Amino acid sequence: MKKFAVAAAGLAVATGAHASDGSATLFGLIDAGVSYVSNEGGKRNVYFDDGIAVPNLWGLRGTENLGGGAKAIFELTSQYALGNGAALPTPGSMFSRTALVGLWSERLGSVTLGQQYDFMTDSLTFGSFDGAFRYGGLYNFRQGPFSKLGIPDNPTGSFDFDRLAGSSRVPNSVKYTSANLNGLVFGLMYGFGNQAGGGLAANSTVSAGLKYETGSFALGAAYVEVKYPQMNNGHDGLRNWGLGARYALSAFDLNLLYTNTRNTLTGAAIDVIQAGVRYVGAPWTIGANYEYMKGNAQLDRNYAHQVTAAAQYALSKRTSAYVETVYQYAGGSAGAHAWINGVMGPDAQSSSRSQFLARIGMLTRF
């Protein structure tokens, strides 16, 4: 990350503050590589892909000292496709990843308003309870043979269905995150539906989460319910909750993760269990995990086994090269075809019960 002094020029004009009263930070993530997929609609494919190990982001974070241990804070983050430079999720969009402003106190915590992550992402992903966040990237998050889950405005109906990839944020939201209380951090969030005549419940989002860390052991839990205008006039949606545990042992750490996703209108539901291990020994970071995804009767009792292995080699403090492999096997109904998360396109689903992926890439942070 690169800090730059904007207080004397920009911030001072906008806020009347002196340079010592605040700061702004430019930050970003860049990832690109080449991926091989064994079966996309019955055919092999080799292609350029980006935003896999980490999403391609750039943004600004800023603070202004208010006195008494309090600060005003803001964050504006844009996502883009490195291959063509287009903004995501749609060309022309700006700061679509996060856009928030708020107040922070070391003693009381923070209150933020805007478009921001719910606690499935905050508590479980950023709490390092998911191997996908630590080494597996987008391909290691969950999708599988569950298109009937029917998430609105979702490219496959089940892409990132438990929300841990952070691909879905909460607009029009108010979020409280506590200070660190002897290792415990908790939070609450409410996202307004902004639907005239719909009351506070329609199209709304409610989320809560916590993380407790002591020594080498950590626990996390999170809940979110998102209601969509396409589902029962904004009174039904998707409900997610999850639990995570992490234990560090010398250069190794182990993680366990459980998530449950339910369509509150149709009753379709998926349970996920993941177990993983990571080794960190400079310049190497090596990780592997296994996850089992199981749908209920509304999803034809389809299931998927998935194994991911990845290795990163640090070229510097900011830049790494990496390799990754993912294998998924799907079962259940006759139409249960494997589909690794992040393999996109009209024929991206495997024509069979298995799909294998290998990737080589690089990432850098600033």
Placement of each model-derived feature along the sequence:
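Structural signature of outer-membrane beta-barrel channels/translocons
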Residues: 61-65, 104-106, 177-180, 211-215, ...
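Extracellular loop and loop/strand-boundary signature of outer-membrane beta-barrel proteins
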Residues: 43-46, 86, 161, 196, ...
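N-terminal signal peptide c-region/cleavage motif recognized by signal peptidases
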Residues: 14-19
